[in-house]
Amino acid sequence: MTSLQIRKLTYAALYLAIALVLPFVTGQIPEIGSMLSPMHIPVLLCGFMCGWPWGLAVGLIAPLLRSVLFGMPALIPSAVAMAFELAVYGAMSGLLYAILPRKPWITYAVLVISMIAGRIVWGIARVILAGMTGSSFTWALFISGAVTNAIPGIILHLVLIPVLVMAMERAGLSLNKPKTAAR
């Protein structure tokens, strides 16, 4: 393993640990704790800072591991659907951030695209899981889960994540280097 690979592995492990612990902090606010989507923050940051493979891996593992270790979220359907959603968050944020120019507005665009793609995948996963378990997942449940109940988390992510990404870039902590065109 190269030094860069070891650093990415270390950063990814840190983001995974934060994803496991952060829900305990927001869970202390019963009214909006889960609506803040605390596990999403370190997964998105991992994608931005470490690249798409690490963001995908942390996103896929975090909800499943948290479910097994702490019983929350429930494994089926929540943790499984979240695993697909967060894997897309981490992969999209890492991939788009590497190929697009590094400008502040691009960070917001990457974040919004990643969030939309992740929510769509979450909805698809929930529909498939509902079919497998014999339950139902309606359009109203999708809108409620992906948009209405998620508004506090969406706002938090749009405010916090770009600021953290820009600060970490300035501090030289990003390991997700821009892809340059072949000459």
Predicted segments with their positions:
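Interfacial aromatic-anchored transmembrane helix boundaries in multi-pass membrane proteins
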Residues: V21-L36, I61-L96, A130, A140
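Membrane-interfacial segments
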Residues: T26-S34, L69, P73, L96, ...
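Alpha-helical transmembrane segments of multi-pass integral membrane proteins
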Residues: E31, V43, P77-E85, V110, ...
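Short helix-perturbing small/polar motifs within transmembrane alpha-helices
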Residues: R7-V21, V58, A79-V127, V165
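Hydrophobic transmembrane alpha-helices of multi-pass small-molecule transporters
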Residues: I41-L44, P63, S67, L86-G90, ...
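Hydrophobic alpha-helical transmembrane segments of integral membrane proteins
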Residues: A19, S34, P38-M39, G59-L60, ...
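Alpha-helical transmembrane segments and their cytosolic interface
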Residues: M1-L16, P104, F137-R183
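Hydrophobic transmembrane alpha-helices
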Residues: M1-M49, P53-W54
